[in-house]
């Protein structure tokens, strides 16, 4: 038996979300159908508002309702440091941490030649232009994931940025507490050694 068309469409739409398979999408569709109408309206409005009201900051590429974004406008931020991240959600994670008070630059991805993602497809050109215009920047922190693509992107960016005389750093990363060295991958071990501190 096939589902009625409205449910089938809703299932198909839920399946467009990352990590949502057919079973989960079906569960969500039926849950949505059982929700109060006001909640469904709020849900649909929030989806539309995200698409209509959010855009990328013209300076850093973070998501924002106003341009430039709140972080770029904040005169109390440390303008000598720019942290380069992959996605807007990474900015949110660092902001929640509350330890970093510099600026950001969001790439909206990483280099991945296998997927057809080169330097032109992510927000690299605007980073280089920004670094050329903003004399107060002294350090660029590459806060990219430890995936092969993240590592390749970090190396590529370092080669572009270092000739300008800026300090380029990478987040220290290493072994998780309680993990066995023999099961750690080479990138984790390399970063653990490079990020070591004196005792």
From Swiss-Prot:
The membrane spanning regions, by residue number, are none
Give a single Pfam family match.
Toprim_4
The cross-references to InterPro entries, in alphabetical order and at most eight, read: DNA_Rcmb_RecR, Rcmb_RecR, Rcmb_RecR_Znf, TOPRIM_dom, TOPRIM_RecR
Q: Where are the zinc fingers (C4-type)?
A: 57-72
**Domain named Toprim: which ranges?**
80-176
Q: What does this protein do?
A: May play a role in DNA repair. It seems to be involved in an RecBC-independent recombinational process of DNA repair. It may act with RecF and RecO.
Protein name per the record: Recombination protein RecR
Decide whether keyword Iron-sulfur is in the record.
no
Q: Which SUPFAM superfamilies match?
A: Recombination protein RecR
Question: Is Cytoplasm a UniProt keyword of this protein?
Answer: no
Gene Ontology MF terms in the entry: DNA binding; zinc ion binding
Write the record's keywords in alphabetical order, separated by commas: DNA damage, DNA recombination, DNA repair, Metal-binding, Zinc, Zinc-finger
């Amino acid at each position: 038996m096939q589902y009625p068309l409205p449910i089938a469409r809703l299932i198909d739409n839920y399946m467009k979300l990352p990590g949502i398979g057919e079973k989960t999408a079906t569960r969500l569709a039926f849950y949505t159908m059982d929700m109060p109408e006001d909640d469904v309206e709020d849900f649909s409005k929030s989806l539309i508002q995200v698409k209509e009201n959010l855009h990328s900051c013209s300076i850093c590429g973070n998501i924002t309702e106003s341009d430039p974004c709140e972080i770029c406008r904040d005169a109390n931020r440390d303008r000598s440091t720019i942290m380069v991240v992959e996605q807007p959600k990474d900015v949110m994670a660092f902001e929640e941490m509350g330890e970093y008070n510099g600026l950001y630059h969001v790439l909206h991805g990483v280099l991945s030649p296998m997927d057809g993602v080169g330097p032109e497809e992510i927000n690299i050109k605007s980073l280089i232009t920004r670094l050329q215009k903003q004399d107060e920047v002294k350090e660029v922190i590459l806060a990219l994931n430890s995936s092969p693509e993240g590592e390749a992107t970090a190396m590529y960016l370092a080669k572009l940025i270092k000739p300008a005389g800026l300090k380029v750093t990478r987040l220290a990363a290493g072994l998780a507490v309680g993990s066995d060295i023999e099961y750690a991958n080479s990138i984790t071990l390399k970063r653990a050694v490079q990020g070591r501190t004196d005792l």
